[in-house]
């Protein structure tokens, strides 16, 4: 019985290769425990049932491990996808010191998707309105009006209701089916017109519908032709007045994907839809779409603009001259102030008259105005706004009407008129306006200036001009204004070509304070340079004597022979050796010293014995001198 149970237990044991190491140990331990607790009295069926239960538990545990591993992978996959979405958000992922949680990131992603969907809906609303020509023909985006019966039939199918209309790019505003035959006959007889690539041309005259067309539309729903100045409600058929056509009507322009541009009027399209469908709410939808278009115009990074040509020969009022020539594409000229399409251009009230460069060149007046005029009044310490213009910015000579000249005044009478802001300064002054110095003063390059003063070129001037240069510029200017007539003491200041306002803004005052501090720091150096007289010729140095030449030639050798000796100690030892040397031994060193002094322009004594043709004798070797010093001195020298 016991042997059979062991045999059965081993036969029911699971395979080793299908279990992990932990599972394998559990099975072995359970089998061993079962063998230890074997009771011969227990029935054979109970032991088999326990083994089968253990085997089922192990199988369930393996299945759970397999299920957990894909969940971890899936969780990691979701986290990585969420991080990729978070990188697409136009916000920072950190708020202060905390990071955004996964839930917050998901909420931001959903809000961003809703924002994008709203913009997509606004863009679709633009493409719902497609082009119908003034004569009543149909044309899609980038299509000619008469291209064949098949395409005309496809575009002339009516729409069932406003809710079922689809916004496709190549569709057109739908018209009733009853006018299909009349429109086909008219489009066949009409000559095709070339497409326009820009909407700068003036709109053509709108042709009123023919009498037979009016008659055909009396029985059913009739669609009045679009009028150029319609604003969301139907109007009777009428052509634009000649005055509007002369000024050039600004209509909404759209570009298709093939870069073909055509004239489009949003409100007129909704007019046709409202009459066609006999529904009360298309006008409200038109107002919503117009608001969307206005929002899209403000949020576009590069809004499409329309160039309005300025012609000085035409009779234009002052308001049109003040207007910015780069007008938005959505602004009709005849729309009232309360219209949602009205976008008032920025008004610049400094340009008037005809023949201005902004009119001749067709450029924006903001290019010709000084940025100093746009500064707030809080920056200015007084109400003279032209001071900021002259101090901060340089006006180029394109402007015929400029602020008071910040340049050279040839006579004191012109100085008095400088504060009155002359409207027509002479051209000789306006030709020299581009030189800028680092101290915020604008120097003139005119030839009339005889003595332009600057702090760097005042080395040869008198002491009075140096004192005036060291003073702050605004003090010099106050002195000049207090004494406008040219006095002998201020003649140099009258000829000065700089002009500085009496009161400057705070940035200029700070800059001048720094410059003044730099001048004060450099002030003690200037008098020293001035007090120095003409430099005398350089004094000759003393002659090099024989002992100095002896030390130069033998000091290193002595230090090599006695390593560790200091240079001063070596000099003392050489001095003792020099005292012991005879005149014959010293003579070569003295001769070499005199030659060295003559070569280097030093003072040399004119002795009768010394001559230029002194023979150079080889000195006694140094080691021999040292050996002789080591010997005891002769008795007559002791």
UniProtKB/Swiss-Prot annotation:
Assigned GO CC terms: nucleus
Residue segments, region Disordered: 1-21, 60-79, 138-249, 404-433, 447-537
Any GO BP annotation: oogenesis
GO molecular function, one term: protein dimerization activity
Pfam families: HLH, HMG_box
SMART domains: HMG
Residue ranges of every copy of the bHLH domain listed in the record: 62-116
Biased composition annotated in UniProt, kind: Polar residues: 7-20, 182-191
Domain of life: Eukaryota
PROSITE patterns in UniProt: BHLH (PS50888), HMG_BOX_2 (PS50118)
Positions of region (Basic motif): 62-75
DNA-binding segment(s): 540-608
Ranges of Low complexity composition bias in the record: 157-167, 453-465
Basic residues biased stretches: 528-537
Basic and acidic residues: bias regions: 412-430
Region listing for Helix-loop-helix motif, in residue ranges: 76-116
Localization (cell): Nucleus
Keywords: DNA-binding, Meiosis, Nucleus, Transcription, Transcription regulation
Subunit organization: Interacts with STRA8.
Function statement: Gatekeeper of meiotic initiation in both male and female germ cells. In complex with STRA8, directly activates the transcription of a subset of critical meiotic genes playing a central role in cell-cycle switching from mitosis to meiosis. Temporal expression of MEIOSIN is required for meiotic entry decision.
Listed name of the protein: Meiosis initiator protein
Organism: Homo sapiens (Human)
Gene name for this UniProt entry: MEIOSIN
